[in-house]
């Protein structure tokens, strides 16, 4: 697993794509923070969590939804295209080590991106006290959400040898889970009750407002595990078929 992790981190941090994604992510995150802070200042007296951090976390989750498919699209699709997946199988590596190494590498990149946004509460703390609890809850939600996104992207990347297809399909699948309950008026009460538990949008709401619900934590972890298990199944099926 360490070998896969080191290789993937090297590929990430020496690729132009990472620096493009990081630049766009941090510039947009900074812009959103500035506009949210301006809104908070203009409407003085608002609760800091609901007046600033809630909207900032909403904006960051949107950025993760857009950027993570770009980070995961090559993880296994490129190995399939180049035929190097079979080469990995010649090493003393089990499938779970390959999957875990690639997943961990992408999560390190996500941590780096989110780490860059920690400057905002640090700067704000020089002007007024900042409660750590709501921030911890919000970032916990972002990490869990990002973990679920990465697992989904890794699974889809295992199904194709095209990075473009993998990235586009990942974004489409995640967006579907995101907007499941947006058009509530068009859904029956039974359908709404069935779909709400699977809505990633709804699962993040409590985190953004400074709370942590164990049901949301459990769902996001199960979502992640399910897609990682699917990735293992896809690799195992490919190994047994013996095709490229």
Residue spans of the language-model regions?
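Aromatic- and glycine-rich beta-strand/loop motifs that create alpha-glucan
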Residues: 1-22, 244
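Terminal transmembrane helical anchor/hairpin motif
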Residues: 35-51, 166-239
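Hydrophobic/aromatic residues in alpha-helical transmembrane segments
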Residues: 68-72, 120, 151-152, 230-231
